[in-house]
């Protein structure tokens, strides 16, 4: 079937898409309508923790679909209880609210912090966030984000999100006032170019929050569920946040997100928060399968080995091609180029024949890598070899 035969104009235009339609995937590979295969190092923007069509997920979906799909969030269901127990047992948090997307989880975190401020801080409502941060595409989460141009895109913004600079504690301190209720950040700023927070900054934020009696919120939508080398990124900084959000990797490809909080922060009253599909057993059962897979003995050790392979490979490529190095945490990494040709490299990689390569360029001079956590050593080596060839070809 030719691409022109697909009625793509029935879809609303929200982004520039190439002229291909993906029809199947397995592991680290996708196949389009013409039968061409692509090595996928985007994985739905760090969503597909176990790659495409993971057998553990397919099994969980089939088994749960045969039992119960959605009885309504007004009732308990077993998979949501099991997943909540797993998440709280593996973290510093006490309670979980399930949602469908990272934006929804972050919106919930904002609402919870503001409710806590009303109860405990005389109505304090401001949440300090970071320039260049990304928290979602609802009006409130866009306002909380620090992406250039977003302050006017759907103006007026939701008020109450002063912006500090990541890894600059003084910039945060200068913004704290009587109306401040929390500080919120990504442990690694993904859209900004894979910029990790430093240990000193994260610990400084915890100390500042304690000194001023405000909340410390970590947005782990992209960094959570093993992506950065530990189950949750905050665990590598030796800090205890008050609130954490998860999405992307927790569902491994299905719509699932979570808002986690410590007991003393859980101030929602009945009716304050909810959602038609939230915590439905079908998605929660997949979440349990993903959690059990990545916490099984040996899984994270294998992912850490692939992290070393990717980091060392990117460093070698950087030295060979005169680039500016690599950075990141775990299997969320970036190759920093010496010029703004990242979009051209992404395009050329996708056009490779007979098999393409899918990459992401959040900045003109930067490539981002978000493979499945169970990517094989052979596929990692293949990607590095393909990337070297593409860079050479683009720069001839």
Curated annotation (Swiss-Prot):
Pathway as given in its UniProt record: Amino-acid biosynthesis; L-arginine biosynthesis; N(2)-acetyl-L-ornithine from L-glutamate: step 4/4
InterPro entries: AcOrn/SuccOrn_fam (IPR004636), Aminotrans_3 (IPR005814), Aminotrans_3_PPA_site (IPR049704), Class-III_PLP-dep_AT (IPR050103), PyrdxlP-dep_Trfase (IPR015424), PyrdxlP-dep_Trfase_major (IPR015421), PyrdxlP-dep_Trfase_small (IPR015422)
Enzyme Commission number, as recorded: 2.6.1.11
Keyword Amino-acid biosynthesis: yes
Residues modified to N6-(pyridoxal phosphate)lysine: 248
One example GO MF annotation: identical protein binding
Domain of life according to the entry: Bacteria
Oligomeric form and interacting partners: Homodimer.
Listed name of the protein: Acetylornithine aminotransferase 2
């Amino acid at each position: 079937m030719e691409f022109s035969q697909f009625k793509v104009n029935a879809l609303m235009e929200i982004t520039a898409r190439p002229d291909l339609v993906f029809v199947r995937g397995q592991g680290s590979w996708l196949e389009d309508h013409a039968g061409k295969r692509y090595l996928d190092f985007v994985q739905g923007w760090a969503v597909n923790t176990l790659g495409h069509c993971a057998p553990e997920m397919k099994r969980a979906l089939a088994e749960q679909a045969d039992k119960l799909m959605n009885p309504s969030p007004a009732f308990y269901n077993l998979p949501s209880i099991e997943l909540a127990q797993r998440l709280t047992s593996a973290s510093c948090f006490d309670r979980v609210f399930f949602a469908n997307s990272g934006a929804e989880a972050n919106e919930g975190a904002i609402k919870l912090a503001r409710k806590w401020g009303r109860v405990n801080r005389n109505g304090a409502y401001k949440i300090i966030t970071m320039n260049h941060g990304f928290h979602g595409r609802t009006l409130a989460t866009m306002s909380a984000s620090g992406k250039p141009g977003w302050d006017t895109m759907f103006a007026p913004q939701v008020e109450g999100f002063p912006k500090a600079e990541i890894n600059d504690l003084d910039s945060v301190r200068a913004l704290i006032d009587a109306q401040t209720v929390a500080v919120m950040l990504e442990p690694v700023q993904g859209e900004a170019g894979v910029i990790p927070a430093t240990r000193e900054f994260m610990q400084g934020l915890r100390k500042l929050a304690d000194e001023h009696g405000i909340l410390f919120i970590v947005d782990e939508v992209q960094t959570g569920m093993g992506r950065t080398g530990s189950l949750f990124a905050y665990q590598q900084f030796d800090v205890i946040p008050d609130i954490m959000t998860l999405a992307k990797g927790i569902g491994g490809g299905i719509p699932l997100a979570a808002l986690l909080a410590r007991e003393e922060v859980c101030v929602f009253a009945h009716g304050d928060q909810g959602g038609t599909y939230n915590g439905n057993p079908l998605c929660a059962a997949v979440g349990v399968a993903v959690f059990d897979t990545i916490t099984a003995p040996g899984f994270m050790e294998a992912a850490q080995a692939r992290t070393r392979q990717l980091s060392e490979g990117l460093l070698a490529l950087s030295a060979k091609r005169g680039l500016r190095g690599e950075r990141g945490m775990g299997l969320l990494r970036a190759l920093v180029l010496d010029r703004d040709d990242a979009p051209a490299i992404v395009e050329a990689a996708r056009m490779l024949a007979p098999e393409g390569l899918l990459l992401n360029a959040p900045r003109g001079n930067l490539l981002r890598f978000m493979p499945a956590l169970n990517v094989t050593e052979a596929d990692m080596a293949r990607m590095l070899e393909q990337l070297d060839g593409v860079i050479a070809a683009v720069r001839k």
